[in-house]
Amino acid sequence: MKCLFLLCLCLFPIVVFSSTFTSQNPINLPSDATPVLDVTGKELDPRLSYHIISTFWGALGGDVYLGKSPNSDAPCANGIFRYNSDVGPSGTPVRFIGSSSHFGQGIFENELLNIQFAISTSKLCVSYTIWKVGDYDASLGTMLLETGGTIGQADSSWFKIVQSSQFGYNLLYCPVTSTMSCPFSSDDQFCLKVGVVHQNGKRRLALVKDNPLDVSFKQVQ
């Protein structure tokens, strides 16, 4: 499994941009770029925070939240979970940092982006707010989502939002070496689905082959 990820990483070209690339030379959005919408039909705004909520209710529902990973020696909470029901607390707010967000534009489907928990935290825990995919967990047979990623870097922190085949949206993990090589692409050949596995009685976000998590986005008031 790990070898597959390394192979995927090697298949993406590394593009080196000129140092003259600045805000005066912004990314040109494709003409067919489709903005991601929240539950009210408004376009996602990279300046705002959102709850990632399930498109289902009751026991099938539950918001995404930041929590302590079992058996983790990290100094801060670094696990990404989903509540076991939509009855209870709201999830941890997130913000989306897309390839175009630095230029005041929105968040779009199939756009490579970073996800960051939008919470106040200590200086020690600042780096434990950015989503990434962790190492392979042999006991669960997959790779778990956690925090500790980096924004805008060629590592394990790149995701996409795509239309679900059922309701709402799906999250994809895309192991890309450079976001600038292809910031917008509908070719998800090398992306993997984000779903849920059960870990110590909790629903943990992880990479899955089937049954991806269907989500919607609700603006934090």
Curated annotation (Swiss-Prot):
Induction record: By sucrose.
Site positions per UniProt: Reactive bond for trypsin: R95, F96
Propeptide regions on this chain: 23-28
Location of the motif Vacuolar targeting signal: 25-30
Disulphide bonds in the chain: C76-C125, C174-C191
Main location: other
Gene Ontology CC terms: vacuole
Annotated site, Reactive bond for chymotrypsin, chain positions: M143, L144
Keywords (A to Z) from UniProt: Disulfide bond, Protease inhibitor, Serine protease inhibitor, Signal, Vacuole
Keyword Disulfide bond: yes
Cell location: Vacuole
Signal peptide positions (record): 1-22
Functional note: Inhibitor of trypsin (serine protease). May protect the plant by inhibiting proteases of invading organisms.
Family assignment from sequence similarity: Belongs to the protease inhibitor I3 (leguminous Kunitz-type inhibitor) family.
The name this protein goes by in its record: Probable serine protease inhibitor 6
